[in-house]
């Protein structure tokens, strides 16, 4: 099914340049591999060479790239091409009827004491336990568990295998063994949240674990009990957040990051992939803590040197102290 450029611009705004609104779009494609009939986008001027070579029927560009885009053919001029592309994908999905229909799949299990909004979609093999609430327009794709008393807001999207409200990891050491701390809280998820496949969000021990509006969690993310994640924060795959940590709004957490428990992360913090956050971060900015990879032989030498840093530091401090006592010229031959 094709879509005319005019339909896209009428729905999303922007301006068509260098071509008529009757140009037919067959699909949305990457700039470098687009074919005639495709709609592509360019958000980074570094890739302008791909623009000149692209065979796309139309390219979404910023005003600064308008002239270069017109030199090759039709374009849609938008202030933020990447955001425009994102909204174009949503429009494409709506027009092609890929939005899940409201209702509960016959294989899903919904407790009689749970509430599911009539406009929500509960997919195959999902389980919604007692007292849980699923908001309007929310989609549970398949094999998802929403635990007792947990609440999910409106227009959320949960991908296969998500578990909401399993017990948090809480045990007390007693007599050489572990005594379980019953997890008496729940999970509260706001509106417009997306949760990737096989991500787990544990219920709180006493208070609830909270995921605020607009949060995006990638696949295989572990959120511990009593964590609080602020609005519009994005967390990439394989990240673990330990219990009772508070992450602010509009943060970006890179893949495979590790965040210890009982920490405070300010609004607007960015964490590089693979970074271990071991103390609170109280100022916005980009934080990194990775040991660079190298050829193994070089890495082993660097690692051996790293183990000696404390001793080397002590020796340097002793030398500096000796120079301070003797004067800066005493050791010059």
From Swiss-Prot:
Homotrimer. CDD domains: LbH_LpxD. Catalyzes the N-acylation of UDP-3-O-acylglucosamine using 3-hydroxyacyl-ACP as the acyl donor. Is involved in the biosynthesis of lipid A, a phosphorylated glycolipid that anchors the lipopolysaccharide to the outer membrane of the cell. The lineage of its organism: Bacteria, Pseudomonadati, Pseudomonadota, Betaproteobacteria, Burkholderiales. This is UDP-3-O-acylglucosamine N-acyltransferase. GO terms for biological process: lipid A biosynthetic process. GO terms for molecular function: N-acyltransferase activity. InterPro entries: Hexapep (IPR001451), Hexapep_transf_CS (IPR018357), LpxD (IPR007691), Trimer_LpxA-like_sf (IPR011004), UDP_GlcNAc_AcTrfase_non-rep (IPR020573).
